[in-house]
Amino acid sequence: MRPSGRSAQQVRPVTLTRHYTKHAEGSVLVEFGDTKVLCTATIEEGVPRFLKGKGQGWVTAEYGMLPRATHSRNAREAAKGKQGGRTLEIQRLIARSLRAAIDLKVLGEFTITLDCDVLQADGGTRTASITGACVALADALNHLVSTGKLKANPMKGMVAAISVGIVNGEALCDLEYVEDAAAETDMNVVMTEDGRMIEVQGTAEGEPFSHEELLKLLELARGGIDTLVAAQKAALTD
């Protein structure tokens, strides 16, 4: 029995609240159970130097956690003077994932920055960030079209992410913190809405996992991501 009473394949309750803040071109509060992340999308004219004159846009991301997002307080990284390795890894993952959702040529020379700020962490902060930021990105792109700055929408489709893992020998979908901490295998999977894989990050924390277990985890991830994509699309029609 899982702590939440969920079945092995069941995701936590998912909520995507759009237009959560008033200034950003796209903003979403995403909730995966008790994990809550504020995702905002900011549009800026121009692109990084390495893309100037190439007629395409760019999508980048930043990620951070509020000091008391976890059980005990963590000092702000700004106070330490540098970002940690985990933070850098996660924000690069978010950016890579969301670039797969759009046609950068159609975007033109605009840069969209996704800021993902974890308000409360209970496992799956990076997967919640990707899932929520994709909705914020969609709203930002709709803004570019509705204001006449773009003729066509660059969005190719939704992208979502989920964690899966093996806990006490059982393959589980969407791990909360206590499950993630006890997992023998921990994996994060990012997919397009039609089930193509963007990124798979998997690690055996204890016993190595078999090929059959890998396939089972990917099957669980696909089911979970189907649920998340349905939630994304429902949110965008509200």
UniProtKB/Swiss-Prot annotation:
Annotated transmembrane regions: none
One of the record's GO molecular function terms: tRNA binding
This enzyme's EC code(s): 2.7.7.56
Residues bound to phosphate: R86, G124, T125, R126
Catalytic activity: tRNA(n+1) + phosphate = tRNA(n) + a ribonucleoside 5'-diphosphate
Alphabetic keyword roster: Nucleotidyltransferase, RNA-binding, rRNA processing, Transferase, tRNA processing, tRNA-binding
EC category: transferase
Keyword Transferase: yes
Coiled coil: none
Cited InterPro entries: ExoRNase_PH_dom1, ExoRNase_PH_dom2, ExoRNase_PH_dom2_sf, PNPase/RNase_PH_dom_sf, Ribosomal_Su5_D2-typ_SF, RNase_PH, RNase_PH_bac-type, RNase_PH_CS
Pfam families linked to this entry: RNase_PH (PF01138), RNase_PH_C (PF03725)
GO terms under biological process: rRNA catabolic process; rRNA processing; tRNA processing
PROSITE patterns per UniProt: RIBONUCLEASE_PH
Subunit field text: Homohexameric ring arranged as a trimer of dimers.
PANTHER family noted in UniProt: EXOSOME COMPLEX COMPONENT (PTHR11953), EXOSOME COMPLEX COMPONENT RRP41 (PTHR11953:SF0)
Function: Phosphorolytic 3'-5' exoribonuclease that plays an important role in tRNA 3'-end maturation. Removes nucleotide residues following the 3'-CCA terminus of tRNAs; can also add nucleotides to the ends of RNA molecules by using nucleoside diphosphates as substrates, but this may not be physiologically important. Probably plays a role in initiation of 16S rRNA degradation (leading to ribosome degradation) during starvation.
Similarity-based family: Belongs to the RNase PH family.
Annotated protein name in UniProt: Ribonuclease PH
Organism listed in the record: Erwinia tasmaniensis (strain DSM 17950 / CFBP 7177 / CIP 109463 / NCPPB 4357 / Et1/99)
Chain's gene name: rph
